[in-house]
A protein has these predicted regions:
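Polar/acidic, low-complexity leader/linker segments enriched in S/T/G and N/D
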Residues: 1-6
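Residues that form generic nucleotide/phosphate-binding pockets
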Residues: 7-10, 146
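Glycine-centered secondary-structure boundary/capping sites
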Residues: 9, 16, 75, 134-137, ...
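N-terminal functional module of multi-domain proteins
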Residues: 12-115
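Alpha-helical bundle regulatory/interaction domains
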Residues: 80-83, 87-161
Length: 161
């Protein structure tokens, strides 16, 4: 099963094909959206998000050791992690979060969002790919400890808040 299916409860209306990359089109009472999913390598998927809706349901229990990297190109995304914990992404913002961090709600308040999501399943990335990433200075064990184990979300703003 593709990683995006474990994170998003999209109830797709139609799919362009079963081949990859794959585009999933969906809608609800607040609008419509689509995600184009592109597998990158074992344990990594890239999703192009084109949303014109207020909200959609997210899956209740995402997999552990999955990192969700988001970049907002246009629009705004907001989510709440429960009492006293929320975040938002505006145009140009970048976020790295543990996918296991349970969201109590999420929305696109402008009904307009374009961005990308990169999903990394740290348990599925091959030793060869890990060594290539380390060569570029990406330490997946350090990321796992900081993001997944500590259940953190790091946001880099394009402009000061």
């Amino acid at each position: 099963m593709a990683m995006y299916k474990s994170l998003f409860d999209l109830s797709p209306e139609q799919t362009a094909s079963t081949a990859m990359p794959r585009t999933v089109v969906f809608s609800n009472g607040t609008g419509s959206g689509s995600m184009t999913i592109c597998p990158l390598f074992s344990g990594a998927e890239l999703c192009y998000n084109d949303m014109h809706l207020v909200s959609f349901d997210e899956a209740p229990a995402p997999a552990r050791n999955v990192i969700e990297i988001n970049h907002c190109r246009v629009g705004r995304y907001e989510c709440s992690f429960g009492e006293n914990s929320c975040c938002y992404l505006a145009a140009g913002d970048f976020a790295v979060c543990a996918a296991a961090r349970k969201k109590s709600s999420s929305c696109f308040p402008l009904r307009h969002y374009h961005g990308i999501t990169i999903l990394l399943d740290l348990d599925a990335i091959s030793p060869e790919m890990r060594s290539r990433m380390e060569w570029y200075g990406v330490n997946l064990n350090a990321i796992r400890q900081y993001i997944c184990t500590e259940n953190r979300c790091c946001i880099l703003r394009s402009a000061p808040v």
